[in-house]
């Protein structure tokens, strides 16, 4: 199983890269986690809508390439209004996908969020929190929760 975090932004602070990499290296080969960064389009003055659409175009283009390599991949848009999952529910989702050999692509937008049309085209929409989270933090938080979900599936003592 392959977990792909497809995210807008390429210049993250060192703590974000270090945090993501720490959980990425803990994941087993049969549930590999990768990060695919999409460069943030140049920001115009005050037009968040066009920025979000440009980001969506870039995400969609890369997503099409991923889905060609893994036709059954499930896409999940991460957004504040998505379905809230607790750690056990996330772990069960991972287990279900792993059991059928389905890859998972998680979409993370830029500072202004995901384009509603891109979000609507995903198989599911999940929320990590009711709080508004900075998109760099989402990378670390999500990597940790994916690792924690795997530890629940395997009985690893990380989650107590």
UniProtKB/Swiss-Prot annotation:
CDD domains assigned: RlmH-like
Domain of life: Bacteria
Protein name, UniProt field: Ribosomal RNA large subunit methyltransferase H
Keyword Heme: no
GO molecular function, one term: rRNA (pseudouridine-N3-)-methyltransferase activity
Subunit structure: Homodimer.
Binding site for S-adenosyl-L-methionine: 78, 109, 128-133
Biological role: Specifically methylates the pseudouridine at position 1915 (m3Psi1915) in 23S rRNA.
Catalytic reaction(s) noted: pseudouridine(1915) in 23S rRNA + S-adenosyl-L-methionine = N(3)-methylpseudouridine(1915) in 23S rRNA + S-adenosyl-L-homocysteine + H(+)
Alphabetical UniProt keywords: Cytoplasm, Methyltransferase, rRNA processing, S-adenosyl-L-methionine, Transferase
Species per Swiss-Prot/TrEMBL record: Alcanivorax borkumensis (strain ATCC 700651 / DSM 11573 / NCIMB 13689 / SK2)
Pfam assignment, any one: SPOUT_MTase
Gene Ontology cellular-component terms listed: cytoplasm
Primary site of residence: cytoplasm
Similarity remark: Belongs to the RNA methyltransferase RlmH family.
Entry's localization field: Cytoplasm
EC number: 2.1.1.177
